[in-house]
A protein has these predicted regions:
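Membrane-interface amphipathic segments in extracytoplasmic regions
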Residues: 2-340
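Helical coiled-coil/dimerization "stalks"
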Residues: 339-366
């Protein structure tokens, strides 16, 4: 019988999280580098794209910027475009679309997805386009400055984007992100005794962590796109996604109609229970997103009646949350066993080496 440890979840999942986007595992206060570590000499080792962003956002951690571009940028020198993705803003849709347009390499499976088609799309290698950081500096500069290059991103109404992240990642205790439930309630719930984190509670959690590098699913969109430095020629919106797809098709001279993949449908849609007061708190957290991307401060969603479902919302949520908690604990045990295996393996190698030395030394002494 497995005895579950009570170690901090973030420590237990650290080895597995390394398979995911590095920007999702950022530590608190990583936004600004230590004093003296961002001198002109230090910037020499970074690519043109990273240096360009740091010129416009001097307080950012260079490594965080580099990691973010390596995972969330898609470049084509031949077709003259650069796409910067934003989580919870059609990013999965765009991955599937780009994968279809540029070929389909063998999917790299992520731990825990067990061959799931949608899950494996999140491996960076599943989209056969290089990040801009993988290009030569001259090509990076050309993509960032040439007037004929389509430099685009896709953003979303901050109100609905945050609700989407809450429904998909927080309510269901997603095992692949930091444990918001434990941060809000003080501990991870026992299986069968979970009470989903309400949207207002999630907003309070964000308010208490301002100044940290948030998970990419609810990080401010300006912190994912660096608009001051990347000189976008087109900023698309989830609400008018077909227009962005049309512009991309024209840029790459794709003559056929591009069908937008229909994904991320949810069976249950718990209400965020937006009020004017709650919306004002969300607006304060994402004010720069509203201002930079042209979203109305009064555009928060009104509650809508959930569509019918053969099971109750509470029953459905309990089932999915329990499943995710089990995955989390299995991941924790997997990480522990991996560490023990590595320790035993190293010890076994040392024993073999000692035996070989004992055999070889007498022969040399003859």
């Amino acid at each position: 019988m497995i005895a579950w440890r009570t170690d901090d979840l973030s420590v237990a999942l650290a080895p597995l999280k390394q398979s995911f986007s590095p920007r999702l595992v950022a530590k608190p206060n990583d936004l600004a580098p230590p004093p003296g570590e961002c001198s002109g000499e230090a910037l020499v080792s970074f690519s043109y794209a990273v240096s360009r962003i740091l010129d416009g956002y001097s307080v950012l951690d260079p490594k965080l910027v580099k990691d973010q571009l390596e995972y969330g940028s898609y470049a084509s020198v031949k077709d003259r475009f650069l796409y910067i993705e934003v989580y919870k803003a059609a990013s999965t849709t765009m991955r599937i679309l780009l994968r279809g347009l540029y070929g389909s390499p063998e999917r790299k499976l992520f731990p825990g997805f067990n061959g799931d088609t949608l899950g494996s799309i999140y491996a960076r290698e599943s989209v056969p386009l290089p990040p801009i950081t993988a290009l030569e500096d001259k090509d990076q500069r050309e993509l960032l400055e040439a007037p004929d290059v389509l430099r685009f991103t896709i953003v979303r109404n901050p109100y609905t984007r945050l609700v989407s992240a809450w429904r998909n990642k927080v309510v269901l205790c997603d095992p692949w992100i930091d444990d918001v439930y434990a941060a809000v309630r003080g501990e991870t719930p026992p299986i069968g005794q979970q009470f989903p984190v309400e949207f207002a509670e999630f907003v309070s959690y964000l308010e208490s962590t301002v100044g940290r590098v948030w998970d990419g699913h609810w990080r401010r969109q300006i912190d994912l796109t660096f608009p001051k430095s990347l000189s976008f020629t087109h900023i698309g919106k989830v609400e008018t996604l077909q227009e962005t797809i049309r512009i991309l098709a024209g840029q790459i001279k794709y003559r056929s109609h591009i069908q937008i993949p229909n994904i991320n449908e949810v069976v249950i849609r718990p209400s965020p229970k937006y009020s004017a007061a709650l919306a004002a708190r969300v607006y304060a957290l994402y004010e720069e997103d509203f201002e930079n991307f042209g979203y109305d401060a009064k555009s928060w969603p009104q509650d809508r009646e959930d569509r019918s479902c053969p099971v109750s919302e509470r029953c459905f949520l309990d089932y999915v949350i329990a499943r995710n908690l089990i995955i989390t604990r299995l991941n924790r045990e997997c990480a522990r066993l991996r560490q023990e295996h590595d320790a035993v393996y190293r010890f076994s190698l040392a024993r073999v080496q000692n035996k070989l030395r004992a055999i070889i030394r007498p022969r040399h002494s003859r």
